From Swiss-Prot:
Pfam families per the UniProt record, alphabetical: SAICAR_synt
Domain of life assignment: Bacteria
Protein name as catalogued: Phosphoribosylaminoimidazole-succinocarboxamide synthase
Pathway in which the depicted protein is active: Purine metabolism; IMP biosynthesis via de novo pathway; 5-amino-1-(5-phospho-D-ribosyl)imidazole-4-carboxamide from 5-amino-1-(5-phospho-D-ribosyl)imidazole-4-carboxylate: step 1/2
Keyword Repressor: no
InterPro entries: SAICAR_synt/ADE2_N (IPR028923), SAICAR_synthase_Vibrio-typ (IPR014106)
Catalysis performed (reactions): 5-amino-1-(5-phospho-D-ribosyl)imidazole-4-carboxylate + L-aspartate + ATP = (2S)-2-[5-amino-1-(5-phospho-beta-D-ribosyl)imidazole-4-carboxamido]succinate + ADP + phosphate + 2 H(+)
Length: 367
């Protein structure tokens, strides 16, 4: 079987029984189960959710997204071998660690296959909850250009690129385009302040104002749990993005939970600690691939300038990247997953057929 066959590039065409349109995101696809199947699985599997909670099958792909575009490699390689399984394995590991440390639950109820989560429907908080321990990336670029206020936080003078910040910072941005919020531009992924959130907590989907402090607590605690665990395997947790939402438990009580993925090479920057101590930045995250793209194309501004999105989309559509760039990224994902979880990721020969087989045999979701 070829390398391209081992990659799950298309994940929105599985014959999973559903009566709603399949939601196809950049990397994951979501299949909302019928009311009948949701209630049957809750009863059969004993999930700790309300009896009428809507459930979904979330299938990750091996597609690689960067700068809001999907990229592909030579030889019809439409993804990164092992990427999907590595991301899910890392998130599963952190969610378990969060639970062991008494933090909040996640939306995941079951893991039928390395590419698949069964999740309960959550009401998302409309915030990209970003936590930063080092000044790098967009924060450093803004700081180097003279900006001293970031998401309403006053930054001190004398900070240096890639160095540890005086304290862990929360620098939130909008999740999607939010309309009608005073002082918040109607655009995706714009920086916001804590005051923006406090003054408009309902518009950001918080149930009550006190939940703002709760999400910040869960964000910092989750960051610290991951940071300490990564330090044990000589990795430095630089910054990350969390997402949160609300669900009801089996007793109907609403609770704030972690959503999406956490502490992965896609949602975080992770540096090799030994190299960092020598003055070198070695990325064990997707950031290394982003840097490759910036160096590979002559006009990096196309990738950084949101006004040039049509040119960027054409760049991704019309270019096959060198095979070694995607294979190098594959090694990054597989190696960091093994370091974090303590187990090697085994590449599937035919992931799509495996998913179909397990969802038919063990969950009765495929006719």
């Amino acid at each position: 079987m070829s390398l391209a066959d081992q990659v799950l590039a298309v994940n929105d065409d599985l014959p999973i029984r559903t009566d709603k349109p399949v939601h196809s995101g950049k990397v994951r696809s979501v299949y909302w189960l019928t009311e009948e199947d949701s209630q049957r699985l809750i009863k059969e599997k004993g999930y700790d959710v309300a009896p009428d909670a809507p459930l979904a099958i979330m299938v990750i792909s091996d597609r690689i997204s960067a700068f809001d575009c999907i990229w592909r490699g030579e030889g019809n390689l439409k993804g990164v071998p092992g990427k999907g399984a590595a991301l899910n394995a890392i998130s599963n590991h952190w969610f378990k660690l969060f639970k062991d440390n008494g933090l909040a639950d996640s939306h995941i109820l079951d893991i039928p296959h390395p590419f698949v989560w069964i999740v309960q429907k959550a009401r998302p908080v409309m915030i990209e909850a970003i936590c930063r321990q080092y000044i790098t990336g967009s924060m450093w670029r803004a700081y180097a250009n003279g900006e001293r206020e970031f998401c309403g936080i006053e930054m001190p003078e004398g900070l240096e690129k890639d160095k540890k910040l005086p304290e862990l910072l929360i620098t939130p941005s909008t999740k999607g385009i939010l309309k009608g919020i005073p002082g918040v531009p109607e655009a995706d992924d714009v920086n916001i302040t804590r005051n923006n959130i406090e003054d408009n907590f309902a518009a950001f989907n918080f149930t009550q104002a006190s939940d703002i402090a709760h999400y910040e607590k869960l964000l910092k605690e989750g960051f610290n749990v991951i940071s300490q665990a990564l330090a044990n395997v000589d990795q430095t947790f630089v910054d990350t993005k969390f997402e949160f939402g609300y669900v009801n438990d089996a007793q109907g009580k609403e609770k704030l939970i972690y959503m999406d993925e956490v502490g992965t090479p896609d949602s975080s920057r992770i540096w090799d600690t030994q190299e960092y101590n020598k003055g070198n930045i070695v990325e064990n995250s997707k950031e290394g691939f982003r840097q490759f793209l910036l160096n590979y194309f002559p006009d990096a501004d196309i990738l950084l300038n949101k006004e040039r999105m049509p040119e960027r989309e054409a760049l991704a559509r019309d270019n096959e990247l060198p095979l070694d760039s995607l294979m190098s990224l594959s090694r990054t994902y597989l190696d960091i997953a093994a370091k974090i979880t303590g187990a090697e990721i085994v590449l599937s020969e035919n992931p799509k057929q495996e998913i179909i087989d397990v969802l038919r045999a063990d969950y009765g979701l495929i006719d």
